[in-house]
A protein has these predicted regions:
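Beta-strand/loop edge motif enriched in small/polar residues
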Residues: 1-232
Length: 232
């Protein structure tokens, strides 16, 4: 079904497929007869998704990313975020197309969920492609199997998500605030400032799945959270 893990109707009019939405990645029924096809609005077909083996992933904790350093995560590895992992001021994270990053199912750091937080002054460059998207998902998820988390109610909130914080103007007294879902005393979780041209990096062909941890009533981490991100 188009919305993902919904239960398929029993009506024989419908055909069960292995992809989400109206179009598969091996054929497109709009090709060669529609105006969209004639005017080259249809993208190229892509190969079936393949991901790195996550049997022995690289486990990333907050201590592994240091301010001012540059890091590169590659598609031949699988990365698991254990707890709240901050990319600190002055640090850069490059993520290769086709890379899979997962939020830990069992957090060992004492945090109540897993998330990647790009702090003010840090940059993330996640340049995926149509053939090789960058996938952020839960540790329990196999991105190549659309049916491994069959219950829609169980498919959300399996980890925190991706949080990007910038230095642009926000509508808060004093010009800054702390992002929801993280301890108010954590200085790296502050966002907002005076630089509307602030540049936090690039997200391109990035898929974020099964995120959105509910920490308490009215307090959660969304799959993707942007706070004070500038136009740079």
């Amino acid at each position: 079904p188009a919305l993902g893990s919904a239960i398929a109707p029993e009506d024989p009019f419908f055909t069960i497929v292995t992809y989400r939405g109206a179009f598969g990645n091996t054929n497109n029924w709009l090709n060669d007869w529609t105006a969209l096809s004639d005017n080259n609005f249809l993208g190229d077909l892509v190969d079936p998704l393949t991901t790195a083996d996550c049997t022995n992933p690289i486990r990333i904790t907050d201590a592994d990313l240091v301010a001012g350093e540059t890091y590169t995560w590659t598609k031949d590895n699988c990365y698991v975020l254990d707890g709240l992992v901050f990319l600190e001021e002055g640090a850069t994270l490059n993520i290769e197309a086709g890379t899979t990053i997962k939020g830990a199912f069992e957090v060992t750091t004492g945090d109540n969920t897993s998330a990647l937080i790009v702090a003010r002054g840090a940059q993330i460059f996640a340049n995926g492609t149509a053939d090789e998207p960058i996938i952020f998902t839960a540790e329990l998820d196999d991105p190549t199997d659309p049916d491994d988390v069959p219950n829609p109610q169980e498919a959300r909130g399996l980890w925190g998500g991706l949080i990007i914080l910038g230095d642009a103007t926000i509508a808060r007294p004093g010009g800054e605030d702390g992002i929801e879902g993280i301890d108010a005393d954590e200085p790296r979780a502050r966002f907002g400032g005076t630089n509307d041209d602030d540049d936090s990096g690039v997200l391109r062909y990035v898929s974020i799945r099964h995120g959105g941890s509910a920490l308490a009533p009215g307090d959660e981490i969304n799959g993707l959270t942007l706070g004070g991100v500038g136009s740079g």
